[in-house]
Amino acid sequence: MFADSIRAAVENPGPSLRSGCGAVSLTDRKYPARAASWVILIRMDAVTLTRQLVDIESISGNEAPVGNYLYGELCRLGYQTIKMPVEGNRFNVYATSAEHPHPAVVFSTHMDTVPPFIPSSEDAGRIYGRGSCDAKGIIAAQVATAERLRQQGIYVGLLFLVGEERDSLGAQIANEYLADGHPSGCRFLVNGEPTENHIALASKGTLRVEVTATGRMAHSAYPELGESAIDKLIPALTRLRAMPLPSDPEIGPCTLNIGLIEGGRAPNVIPDYAHADLLYRLVGSSEDLRQQIRTTAGDRVEVTFPLELPFLRLRIVDGLPTMIAKFTTDIPKLTNWGEPLLLGPGSIHVAHTDGEYIEKQQLAESIDLYCQIAKHLLEQPK
């Protein structure tokens, strides 16, 4: 089957993927009927490229197979392509044109997906499968954009990252890559996420909060001999849920999700441990909110803040429809890559669902839109 063949190819890469640029193409070996011209494929059929990418499982931590695939094909197209080491066998893919190795505009998105893997399928109007809109359809659109522009003598970069769905580690490493002295020239970063081709005015931030309670185990028949951690945690969470949150008249309210609660050992044991993971979507600075959370949670629990991605206002392009991204992206970790813009095909409302899809028409329109934006940005004075 199509999906089985491509998974086998990337999980057991032959010489083409091990030897780097200029090698025989994986596509030639596995899809001779489709591979008469990879250039025609990405210019004419982003649908096919999207399906190929979706059919390579790349749940966060396992991005190497799809990274190898993209690296090999971008090399074959003639791009100067590098694997930017992240950790273990994980790497980002960065591609530029030999004619202009330090592009002013770079298109970026992520290669990883949330679980579980769902292979691709399609009907007349949609492509389905895990990552179809978040964000493998966007990868296909950005590669097609770079090729279309290159045929017009306009050169942009492509930056495909690992780990966005988990901790943005790939973005952090990409930022350090430039900080370590690698020349860029990048003035604008066009980050792709599913915004239905609307350009984002702003992106909400993320504040992850861990609330932990400890107690003392005892037989449940003698609760007075123990101390229930769950009895400490539940009131703290109840107070946090009732706590007023800040709001922005343009962006909307800060929101809270209690995403995970765990604790206890058995129904007949007084629990000595309880824990909750919370996620706040920020609409401004977190400084006052952090203090409010600590005070509201109280002194019977421990509160920590393991992750924050700040709220951002973003550059827009006049004449394009706008939206507010209530989700977070890699952008806060890519500060060395120029002024950020955020848009892409697909709807965030179906991302991470078992029915994830991308509209074929929206995919095609995004290539036109990305090309227009790149040209507009390149016209801006330095």
Predicted regions, residues:
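Short beta-strand segments
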Residues: S108-T109, L159-L161, L189-E193, T212-T214, ...
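Acidic/histidine-rich catalytic neighborhood of metal-dependent amide-processing enzymes
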Residues: A140-R208, D248-P249
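Secretory-pathway/membrane protein signature
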Residues: S16, P32-R43, Q52, L77-G78, ...
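Metal-dependent amide/peptide-bond hydrolase catalytic core
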Residues: I82-K83, P194, L201-A202, R208-K382
